[in-house]
Regions:
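Active-site acidic carboxylates
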Residues: 1-57, 67-71, 100-103, 120, ...
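Short, conserved glycine- and acidic-residue-centered signature motifs
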Residues: 6-10, 79, 83, 87, ...
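Residue-level marker of alpha-helix boundaries and capping positions
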Residues: 8, 32, 81, 110-111
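Short, ordered loop/turn segments at secondary-structure junctions
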Residues: 33-34, 106-109, 135
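Short glycine-/acidic-enriched loop or helix-start segments at secondary-structure transitions
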Residues: 39-41, 87-90, 113, 142
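Internal catalytic-core helix/loop-beta-alpha segment
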Residues: 55-96
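Short gly/pro/ser/thr-enriched loop/turn and capping motifs at secondary-structure boundaries
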Residues: 59-61, 85, 108-113, 138
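A short glycine-rich beta-strand->turn/loop micro-motif centered on a GG-aromatic cluster
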Residues: 77-80, 100-113
Length: 157
């Protein structure tokens, strides 16, 4: 991940949203691209995932992501790297499979900003929603009266 532009901030945002998802009992599935040659996901992030799909294709759906998804959850939130390669190809496949796909722009990255920007433009044009970690957290909570509001707020702030 060190080759990804702004990788420390991206990892921080990925950890924020996965911690929030865990608090709210939202399933978390990770993917790892060719870990035998590229290495594993950050251990702190991997520990928050209920499962991790190991993949060699850039599109995680080809290596079993769709089969791993809960059947009762048509809305998906995607984060990760690289925006214009793995994340984009996976999101396009999920959109074609009629999932409601949102991309957390502050929790995605590429080696170059230009690639990330054009990957996000392509995803928006294909029907993906572009959101931020904070937007999704508050959307999940719906109200300051949510029983987990203070716990989530501690992560957001």
């Amino acid at each position: 991940m060190p080759v990804i532009e702004d990788h420390e901030s991206i990892l921080k945002q990925c950890l924020r949203i996965t911690n929030i998802a865990r608090i709210l009992d939202i399933p978390i599935i990770g993917t790892e691209q060719s870990p035998q040659s590229l290495g594993n996901n950050a251990e702190a992030l991997k520990a928050l995932c209920q499962m991790t799909v190991i993949k060699d294709h850039f599109d995680a759906c080809i290596d079993g992501l769709i089969e791993a998804l809960p059947k009762d959850r048509p809305q998906l939130i995607l984060t990760g790297c690289e925006t214009h390669i793995c994340l984009m190809q996976t999101a396009l496949h999920l959109l074609a499979a009629h999932y409601d796909v949102s991309i957390l722009v502050d929790a995605t990255g590429s080696r170059a900003t230009l690639n990330k920007d054009y990957g996000l433009q392509n995803l928006r044009a294909a029907g993906a929603k572009l959101l931020t970690v904070e937007m999704v957290a508050y959307e999940w909570l719906k109200s300051s009266k949510h029983p987990k509001f203070k716990e989530v707020l501690a992560i957001i702030k």
